[in-house]
Each structure stands twice: as structure tokens, then as C-alpha cells.
UniProtKB/Swiss-Prot annotation:
EC assignment: 3.1.11.6
Similarity remark: Belongs to the XseA family.
Name this protein carries in UniProt: Exodeoxyribonuclease 7 large subunit
PANTHER family to which the protein is assigned, alphabetical: EXODEOXYRIBONUCLEASE 7 LARGE SUBUNIT (PTHR30008:SF0)
Chief location: cytoplasm
Annotated organism of origin: Stenotrophomonas maltophilia (strain K279a)
Annotated GO biological process: DNA catabolic process
Compartments (UniProt record): Cytoplasm
Length: 443
């Protein structure tokens, strides 16, 4: 059967009909695909293919639309496009003509991350000079994270092993999804406003950029920067970075490392206490040596001065010094002993019993040594004082008179008479003997 003349089409007529059918059936559609065979000739138009694992189609974006793109299309990039399905009449090729194209998936998120990071950095939000130092001793910690994730288990395990005395409050929250960022921000602001915590820890485990996106929220980054309480961010793995890391006062590569940075190891703390106790013993010995040196110098000064009144004064001073030194030393010893008892009570539940017993025996030994040393010092000083008193009595003029000698002085002016040529017949003298004074006259 032969067709009628009006039923016979030329290729151009068929392509025109097919084009009209396609354009009428698909007014404007969205397609997500991977770019391939990207070409940009001098005309400024863009030509490429849109493909997935099973198929591909040609696409074009003309210069009037392509000039407004916010990125440079490259081979392998995943994009989201909008356009019309049509047919290129000259070659009979089915294609899409696009009026919009944007990055899709992680590529779009990465670009948004870099743009927001650059803007906040320009505002000074990440300036190191703005960051607050962490306290030396963290006593109360707020942990904002998922209550069921691996991050909270890692953090609590490390904290319990290193420093079980730390008070930890878990503030549970979503860590991914559309509402996670707002919830994290509210918890952070509430924890900061309460004034109860020394540090706030934001943390979650690893994941894709999309999984971690809640921690790239602008409002959360600004809340971290405005917090009066120091904030530590430990989001994802060591290679993951989020805006919360840049805004926080300290960025930890993993949740476990964050816990290690926040608290000391109880074993290191015990070693530090033992070193402190040894230092206290050394200081006590030094104080005793200084006291003995001062006492020796006081005795030397005492031996160089002969009047009995000064001797008595120095004796009283020396005794007073001994009493005061003893009292001060006992007070210092009691304070140090109290500190050691407190340290022993704190660590009693976390250290071997033999270490506590050793510290108590050392404390008992320290109590006895200062008292014995002080007693020996006082006895030695008393012995020296008695010897000095006997020496003074031996050379005293009054002792010489008591042995039968007399001291002659002139009655008129009290001058001591040592030689015969000092007197003349008729001079009145006084003779001082052991039990009184005799008036005499020279003949």
C-alpha cells in the first residue's frame, strides 16, 4: 500500500514534530546528574552531557544564562539543573537546554561552608586573640552531644579513667538533621547563662559533610564566640573541620582527645602529690637549719658581750625565740599534715592502700623529728649559757674582794687607788671589803 503524498514527511518535518512533542510534554524539569564532556567555546555557551550510571543525555546552557553561574562546571561534578527537553533539528539530537545550574550534594555544601567561613573570619569571629583560656582545674563540665552516639561513650570512658572526681552533666541533643543546629545552639546558650560550668564541650562522632552540617550553622558559630564559658569543639574525625571548631576556644581532633585535654590523669596527680610532700620535708629541714644558724649567731654575739644585764637579756630573747620557733614550726607542720590528710582522703578510693600507709608513716616520722631536734638545740644553748655565767663570775671584781682583798678609792672623788704615789699623808680613803666599806686615813 502506497502512502498518500500528505502522509510523507521530510526529516526536518519529523524533527520539528518530535521537538514540539518533547517541549509540550516537558515544560520545565529538574535533573540531578554528573557532568561529563564539558566544553566552553569562545562563544561563551556551555556544552556537556548529563549522566548517571546507566544513561546520559546532551545538554547546553547558552551564554546569557551561563555568565551568572557561581561556580566553574568541571568534569565529574555533581549538579542540579533546570531546563526544557528539546530536539536539535539540524542533527535530530535529543537534549536539554538549561536556564539554571547549581552544585549538588557535598560539593554544594563545601562551597557554602567556604563562603560562610570566609565571611565570619573577615568579621574577626575566629581571631585567636578573642579566644578564652581553659581553666587549669575543671570541676564541672557540660557535654552537649547525642546520648546514644559513640562520642559520648568515648568521652565518659576517658573522663572516668583519668579523673573520676569530675562532675559531668550530659545535655542530650540531636547532632544531625534540620533541627539539630537550633537545638545545639539553645543548649549552649542555656549552659553558658547558668554559670554552673567551667567548660562546655560540643562533640559528635565522624560522618559525611552533610552529617556534620549542624556544626557549620552560622547562629551556632556566633553563640560559641559570644559564650562567656570556654567552649571546646570535638566534631568528627581528625581530618574533619567545622565552623564550631574555628569559633571554639579549643578544637580537639576527636572526642577522646578532648576528654584527655580537659582533665589530668589521676596517676600523674598522685605523683605530683608525692613530689609536693618530699618538697615539704626539704623545706622543713631548711627551716630547721636556718633556726639553728640564727641561734649560733645569737650565742656568738652573747659571748662577745660581758655585762650581766645583756647576758640575761639575750638569754630571755633566746628562750623566747625558741618558744616562737617551736610554735610556728608546729603550726606549719600541722597545716602540712592537714593537707596530706586531705590528699590521702581524696585519693583513698583511687590509689593502692600501701601508698596511703607509706604517706601516713612518713607524716608520723616528720612529727617526731622537729621536736627532738628542738629539744637538743635548747639543751645545748642552756649548757653554753651556764658555762658563760661561770666565766663571768670568775673574773668579777666582787669575787676577788670576797677572797680577802679590798678596793681603795678616794673619799672626795671616788678615784680608784692603784699605786702608793696617788695618796699623801692625811688623805681620806675608803676600803671596800667583802662585807662592807671602811673609812681610813693615810699617815
Amino acid at each position: 500500500m502506497q502512502p498518500r503524498n500528505n502522509d510523507i514527511l521530510t526529516p526536518s518535518q519529523l524533527n520539528t514534530l518530535a521537538r514540539d512533542l518533547l517541549e509540550g510534554s516537558f515544560p520545565a524539569i529538574w535533573v540531578e546528574a554528573e557532568l561529563g564532556s564539558v566544553a566552553r567555546p569562545a562563544s561563551g555557551h556551555l556544552y556537556f552531557t548529563l549522566k548517571d550510571a546507566r544513561a546520559q543525555l546532551r545538554a547546553a546552557m547558552f551564554r546569557m544564562k551561563a555568565q551568572y553561574l557561581k561556580f566553574v562546571p568541571r568534569e565529574g561534578m555533581r549538579v542540579l539543573v533546570r531546563g526544557k527537553v528539546t530536539l536539535y533539528d539540524a542533527r535530530g539530537e535529543y537534549q536539554m537546554v538549561l536556564d539554571h545550574m547549581e552544585e549538588a550534594g557535598e560539593g554544594a555544601l563545601r562551597r557554602a561552608f567556604e563562603e560562610l567561613k570566609a565571611r565570619l573570619e573577615a568579621e574577626g569571629l575566629f581571631d585567636p586573640a578573642r579566644k578564652r583560656p581553659l581553666p587549669t582545674h575543671v570541676q564541672r563540665l557540660a557535654v552537649i552531644t547525642s546520648p546514644t552516639g559513640a562520642a559520648v561513650r568515648d568521652v565518659l570512658s576517658v573522663l572516668g579513667r583519668r579523673f573520676p572526681l569530675l562532675e559531668v552533666d550530659l545535655l542530650p541533643t540531636l547532632v544531625q538533621g534540620s533541627s539539630a543546629a537550633a537545638q545545639i545552639t539553645r543548649l549552649l546558650q542555656a549552659a553558658d547563662a547558668s554559670g554552673r560550668y567551667d567548660v562546655i564541650l560540643l562533640t559528635r562522632g565522624g560522618g559525611s559533610l552533610e552529617d556534620l552540617w549542624a556544626f557549620n550553622d552560622e547562629a551556632l558559630a556566633r553563640a560559641i564566640a559570644a559564650s562567656r564559658t570556654p567552649v571546646v569543639s570535638a566534631v568528627g574525625h581528625e581530618t574533619d573541620f567545622s565552623l564550631s571548631d574555628f569559633a571554639a576556644d579549643l578544637r580537639a581532633p576527636t572526642p577522646s582527645v578532648a576528654a584527655e585535654l580537659l582533665v589530668p590523669d589521676q596517676r600523674e596527680l598522685a605523683l605530683r602529690l608525692r613530689r609536693t610532700a618530699a618538697r615539704m620535708v626539704q623545706l622543713q629541714r631548711h627551716a630547721m637549719q636556718q633556726a639553728m644558724q640564727r641561734a649560733d649567731r645569737a650565742l656568738l654575739r652573747l659571748n662577745a658581750q660581758s655585762p650581766q644585764a645583756r647576758l640575761d637579756l639575750l638569754r630571755r630573747r633566746q628562750l623566747d625565740l625558741g618558744r616562737r620557733l617551736h610554735a610556728v614550726f608546729n603550726q606549719q607542720q600541722e597545716r602540712r599534715a592537714a593537707r596530706l590528710r586531705h590528699a590521702a582522703a581524696v585519693l583513698r578510693g583511687h590509689h593502692p592502700q600501701r601508698q596511703l600507709d607509706a604517706m601516713q608513716r612518713r607524716l608520723a616520722a616528720l612529727r617526731g623529728r622537729p621536736q627532738a631536734a628542738m629539744q637538743r638545740l635548747l639543751e645545748r644553748d642552756a649548757l653554753r649559757l651556764r658555762g658563760l655565767a661561770r666565766s663571768l663570775e670568775a673574773v668579777s671584781p666582787l669575787a676577788t674582794v670576797a677572797r680577802g682583798y679590798s678596793i681603795l678609792t678616794r673619799t672626795d672623788d671616788g678615784t680608784l687607788v692603784r699605786k702608793v704615789n696617788q695618796v699623801q699623808p692625811g688623805d681620806a680613803l675608803q676600803a671596800r671589803v667583802g662585807d662592807g666599806v671602811i673609812d681610813v686615813q693615810v699617815k
